[in-house]
Amino acid sequence: MLSSRERVLTALEHEEPDRVPLDLGGSPTTGMHVSTVYALRQALGLDPPGTPVKVVEPFQMLGEIAPDLQEALGVDVVGLCSKTNFFGFKNEDWKPWRLFDGTPVLVPGKFNTEPNDDGSIYMYPQGDKSAAPCARMPRGGFYFDALDRQIRPVDWDNLDVKDNLEEFGPISSEELEFFRREAERLYQETDKAILANFGG
């Protein structure tokens, strides 16, 4: 029987592994909504009722696929993620929160929301409520929609690619060191294939 890492590498080499490799939660593309993760954990008996699940990607409200769930489902991939999430704050200092349907979750400390008059919820960039909201979850919704915060109108006749690069730059030495340490930890502590999520 192949290890998870060997299974993925075998498939990437266009050879047939012992079974099809499975990625669930290794990246935002393969994530699962936190309410579904909660229901799955309950169905598998992994948690007592009411145990919250961490929201690891708050824009889509993706839930953590923790090691016990990875093992229960035979997941072969683990994510190497940035220190900050889509909204620009770290996934740390967890605090309780509830979805519209009542599902208990844990969100990062800077997950700062504000209710709107229509029952929707506003989210703020980097958790900074002094800034204009950057996303909105509709009343009864499951995830956030980005808000247009454009300051000046688009001049379609004079587009310049540099105008779209202000939020992108080289990865800092600190961030590279974080990725190096985290990749090493995941390699040593798991037998999973490591999927790097550098953002961008």
Language model features: what each stretch is:
Residues 1-200:
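Catalytic cores of TIM-barrel enzymes
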